[in-house]
Amino acid sequence: MSFRGKRMKNVANQRYYLVREDVLTDAMQKTLEAKHLLSSGSVSSIWDAVKQVDLSRSAFYKYRDAVFPFHSIVQERILTVFLQLQDRKGTLAKLLETVTITHCNVLTIHQTIPIQGRANVTLSLDVTSMTCDLDDLIQQLKRLDFVESAEVISSGAL
């Protein structure tokens, strides 16, 4: 399956880890710095952010959806998930039912118009009362037969 013109890795069994900053690669650390510059409003574009921290744009795009500062996850407890769904009747309702069962509070929903039998959905969730861990939630979403991909795109403040 391709996504944005690139071959996607099989993400069905991805897990999330908490690691110390000193074990992150230089590119990962600079990606976090660039994301901070963007979220704080210090810079107005990705190009400006990566230039300021001396990082290539390709490295930024490689890591931007994979590394998150721990404090933002703990403080905000807001999770944004991107899903690609098959266009079938009732998919959004079933997706929201799955999210509700885990006691996540849906803050925003954005769904694109289905094109070629697929639609993209972005959910912003308050996970303060979530009854499972993040890995379990993502796995539950991926197990839905109409979900082609599900990935965390942000957690807390970027």
Swiss-Prot record:
InterPro entries found in the cross-reference section: ACT-like_dom_sf (IPR045865), ACT_dom (IPR002912), UPF0735_ACT_dom-cont (IPR008310)
PROSITE patterns reported in the protein's UniProt record: ACT (PS51671)
Chain ranges of the ACT domain: 80-155
HAMAP family named in the record: UPF0735 (MF_00707)
Family according to the record: Belongs to the UPF0735 family.
The protein's name in its UniProt record: UPF0735 ACT domain-containing protein Bsph_3944
Upper lineage: Bacteria, Bacillati, Bacillota, Bacilli, Bacillales
